[in-house]
Regions:
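Conserved catalytic alpha/beta core of Sir2/sirtuin-type deacylases, generalized to analogous enzyme cores
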Residues: 2-14, 19-347
Length: 347
């Protein structure tokens, strides 16, 4: 059974072009060692990916958190310091993710934090054009995207929203916290109001090389302005039906709302897969780890094992694993996704 814990791991970096090599030999190449050889092995794999992409009747992209990280959407470091240094100083957490679980004393503080979190990760584009470059690779193919990411970078890069299935929610949606009903609500307007109430400006200009989002733009701290860590009580979002506080539409527990849009996307994905059964189907997995492997990774392995004309690609620096059972119809590239995509565009 291919779900046994038998995997092949690929190591080595990429720096130049190379000719296509036999997949099975490449999947065992790391037994030989040597940096220059590893470079050639990695680049040969990229050539195979390019070849399979060109030959494919359709492409299914499976995207995890590692893809947005490769695009520059980091939750710590400079981005965190730029937008959350005041929260960090007061509460002691060191990254956005940790702050998202902090038990704030008031809803006014909670939503001050989350309005920043949502805006910089949902309504601003990532610092690099990685998603745009991926779109260039597949825009003329019959494609579908399955993703556990909630930042909507695919749609911002030009991917058809009818070909996207966001399984875990969307930073751009609110829901009732109970929930008392299965509807979600766009939050961009109210998020902007929360930010303005804290003293931020929303500028059309780029800030510190982080390019503005297509819907609206960069978040700026005006000079000589004291940014507030709270919002007015009237800006705390409440359910229009029961009056309870709203929450983010993120799959954190059993209160997650799967609205009509979620089910329509799931149905479109299912039909896409059924319509392409038996065709040359490329499963392109990008930045998927092991937090929720059953959504993308394990399903892609099953399809590769059971569908004769399927081919599986895993690109993920440090986690490019392929089950031995499908090693002859799969390839793993242990390299930064942005580097690989640039190589693919250059071929």
């Amino acid at each position: 059974m291919f779900l046994r814990k038998r995997t092949s791991r690929y190591t080595g970096d990429c720096s130049a072009k190379a000719k296509t090599a036999d997949v099975d030999n490449l999947n065992r190449a790391d037994d030989f060692g040597g940096k220059s050889m590893m470079d050639n092995v990695c680049l040969n794999k990229i050539n195979i990916v390019k070849e399979k992409l060109e030959q494919a009747d359709a492409v299914v992209i499976g995207a995890g958190a590692g893809l947005s990280t490769a695009a520059g959407f980091t939750y710590s470091g400079e981005r965190f310091d730029r937008y959350f240094s005041d929260f960090a100083e007061k509460y002691g957490f060191k990254d956005m993710y940790s702050g998202g679980f902090y038990d704030f004393d008031t809803l006014e503080e909670y939503w001050a934090y989350w309005s920043r979190y949502v805006y910089v990760n949902r309504y601003m584009n990532p610092p690099s054009p990685l998603y745009d470059n991926i779109f260039e690779l597949v825009k003329n193919k019959d494609y579908f995207v399955l993703t556990t990411n909630v930042d909507h970078c695919f749609q911002k890069a030009g991917f058809d929203k009818e070909r996207l299935y966001y399984t875990q929610g969307d930073y751009g949606l609110f829901q009732c916290s109970k929930p008392c009903h299965d509807s979600t609500y766009d939050n961009e307007d109210i998020i902007r109001k929360k930010l303005l109430s804290q003293g931020f400006k929303i500028s059309e200009e780029h800030e510190n090389s982080e390019k503005a989002g297509k819907t609206g733009t960069a978040l700026v701290k005006p000079q000589n302005t004291q940014i507030k860590l709270t919002i007015p009580s009237e800006l705390v979002p409440r359910c229009p039906r029961c009056g309870r506080p709203m929450s983010m539409n993120l799959r954190a527990d059993n209160t997650f709302v799967q609205d009509d849009g979620w089910y329509r996307a799931a149905d479109r994905y299912g039909k896409f897969m059924e319509n392409h059964r038996g065709q040359k189907l490329l499963f392109l997995e990008l930045g998927v780890g092991y937090n929720t492997p059953g959504i993308i990774k394990y399903n892609f392995w099953r399809y590769a094992a059971n569908w004769k004309n399927a081919f599986y690609v895993c690109i993920n620096k440090g986690e490019a694993y392929v089950p031995e059972d499908i090693a002859e119809k799969a390839v793993g590239v242990n390299e930064d996704i942005a580097v690989v995509v640039d190589e693919l565009k250059a071929l």
